[in-house]
């Protein structure tokens, strides 16, 4: 077995009770596919990539357990029909993936995020 195949998103879950859940699912799938080369290079894994709509409108993403669950906001706060632009969600995903290597927002974290953004955004 090629161990590189393990470094990916394993499961994707959009919020089914929200409007346009099929569009949300496709967005998450596209993001997972786009970041797979990064994940393979850095040996990062995400068990579940899911959509969330937190009460805090400034919260765009969350990485729980070093990649056990990465949650992304796909919709604008209190506007379920309005999706956040794809590149912004992709940037949030890159940010959350960097937490697989560095928990806190320190200089090492921001350097890694900046380096990845230069290549993939």
Task: Write out the residue ranges for each language-model feature.
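Walker B catalytic acidic pair
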Residues: 96
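Active-site-proximal or metal-binding-adjacent scaffold patches in catalytic folds
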Residues: 1-90, 100-121
């Amino acid at each position: 077995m090629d161990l590189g195949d393990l470094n990916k998103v394993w499961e994707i879950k959009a919020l089914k009770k929200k409007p346009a859940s099929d569009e949300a699912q496709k967005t998450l799938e596209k993001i997972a596919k786009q970041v797979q080369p990064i994940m393979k290079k850095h040996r990062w894994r995400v068990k579940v990539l899911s959509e969330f709509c937190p009460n805090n409108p400034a919260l765009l993403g969350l990485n729980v357990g070093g990649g056990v669950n990465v949650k992304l906001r796909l919709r604008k706060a209190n506007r379920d029909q309005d999706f956040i632009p794809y590149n912004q969600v992709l940037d949030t995903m890159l940010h959350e993936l960097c937490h697989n290597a560095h928990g806190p927002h320190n200089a090492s974290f921001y350097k890694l995020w900046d380096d990845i953004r230069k290549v993939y955004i």
